[in-house]
């Protein structure tokens, strides 16, 4: 019997999840950045800048942006590594990748963009100085496999950054639930004409591992000195780990 996994609150066959997630992101790609600004009141930009500040990048370094979508982090990383460095933008979803590529082309930038699965990265071992995945890990079917792949492609001494929605501070749970399950789908319907995708967003956040659980998963994948930093009362957490 085929194994099952969660797609939001639904239980689906593992073989079906990727296609269902793809449908969500094909649907929201064109309005993705606008919705991020609306949903977070612009805070997502601060979260991402904090993540980049924790990357420890220098000119000439190689960075892999997994599930990089519309290239917010890629564009920030490019400023850090300079002309002598490399930033690879990847995403499994072509619609999202196209949005990111087009944004960079409009800015006169031409970094490489690769459509690939974060659970099966087509890159050599011990290659990148830094790997990031922002708001992408929770959509992956086999998170442990994805973390192992990110560990594989990092060079010894390199670091992984996982920026993801997490478990909010308990006194705020009721208000956060109201916002997530009532306002998010409403905004999705009004702005993107797609309430269902934002209902999935709220559900996928609740099903994603919390701070300590994700820390343990990273350690199981081989990362050392794993730590995390909560932002906005735990709405988002940045996990950081190193390959030794």
Curated annotation (Swiss-Prot):
SUPFAM superfamilies (UniProt xref): S-adenosyl-L-methionine-dependent methyltransferases
Keyword Translocase set for record: no
Residues that bind S-adenosyl-L-methionine: 70, 91, 117-118
Protein EC: 2.1.1.163, 2.1.1.201
Domain of life according to the entry: Bacteria
Pathway(s) of this molecule: Quinol/quinone metabolism; menaquinone biosynthesis; menaquinol from 1,4-dihydroxy-2-naphthoate: step 2/2; Cofactor biosynthesis; ubiquinone biosynthesis
Reactions it catalyzes: a 2-demethylmenaquinol + S-adenosyl-L-methionine = a menaquinol + S-adenosyl-L-homocysteine + H(+); a 2-methoxy-6-(all-trans-polyprenyl)benzene-1,4-diol + S-adenosyl-L-methionine = a 5-methoxy-2-methyl-3-(all-trans-polyprenyl)benzene-1,4-diol + S-adenosyl-L-homocysteine + H(+)
Molecular functions per Gene Ontology: 2-methoxy-6-polyprenyl-1,4-benzoquinol methyltransferase activity; demethylmenaquinone methyltransferase activity
Keyword Methyltransferase attributed: yes
Keywords tagged on the record: Menaquinone biosynthesis, Methyltransferase, S-adenosyl-L-methionine, Transferase, Ubiquinone biosynthesis
Biological process (GO), any one: aerobic respiration
Gene3D superfamilies cross-referenced by the UniProt entry: Vaccinia Virus protein VP39 (3.40.50.150)
CDD domains hit by this protein: AdoMet_MTases
Top-level EC class as recorded in UniProt: transferase
PANTHER family reported for this sequence: 2-METHOXY-6-POLYPRENYL-1,4-BENZOQUINOL METHYLASE, MITOCHONDRIAL, METHYLTRANSFERASE
Similarity comment: family membership: Belongs to the class I-like SAM-binding methyltransferase superfamily. MenG/UbiE family.
Function: Methyltransferase required for the conversion of demethylmenaquinol (DMKH2) to menaquinol (MKH2) and the conversion of 2-polyprenyl-6-methoxy-1,4-benzoquinol (DDMQH2) to 2-polyprenyl-3-methyl-6-methoxy-1,4-benzoquinol (DMQH2).
Protein name: Ubiquinone/menaquinone biosynthesis C-methyltransferase UbiE
Protein encoded by which gene: ubiE
């Amino acid at each position: 019997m085929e194994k099952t996994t969660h797609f939001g609150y639904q239980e689906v066959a593992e073989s079906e999840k990727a296609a269902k997630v793809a449908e969500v992101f094909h649907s929201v790609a064109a309005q993705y950045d606008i919705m991020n600004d609306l949903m977070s009141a612009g805070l997502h930009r601060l979260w991402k800048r904090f993540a980049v500040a924790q990357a420890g990048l220098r000119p000439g370094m190689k960075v892999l942006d997994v599930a990089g979508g519309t290239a917010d982090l890629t564009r920030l990383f490019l400023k850090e590594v300079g002309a002598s460095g490399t930033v690879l933008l990847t995403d499994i979803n072509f619609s999202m990748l196209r949005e990111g590529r087009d944004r960079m082309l409009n800015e006169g930038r031409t970094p490489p963009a690769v459509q690939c699965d974060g659970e099966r990265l087509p890159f050599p071992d011990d290659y990148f100085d830094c790997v990031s995945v922002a708001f992408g890990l929770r959509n992956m079917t086999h998170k442990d496999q994805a973390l192992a792949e990110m560990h594989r492609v990092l060079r010894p001494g390199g670091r992984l950054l996982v920026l993801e929605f997490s478990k909010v501070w308990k006194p705020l749970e009721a208000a956060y639930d109201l916002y997530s399950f009532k306002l998010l789908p409403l905004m999705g319907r009004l702005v993107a004409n797609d309430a269902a995708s934002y209902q999935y967003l709220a559900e996928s956040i609740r099903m994603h591992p919390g701070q300590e659980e994700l820390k343990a998963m990273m350690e199981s994948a081989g990362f050392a000195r794993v730590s995390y930093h909560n932002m906005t009362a735990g709405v988002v957490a940045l996990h950081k780990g190193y390959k030794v």
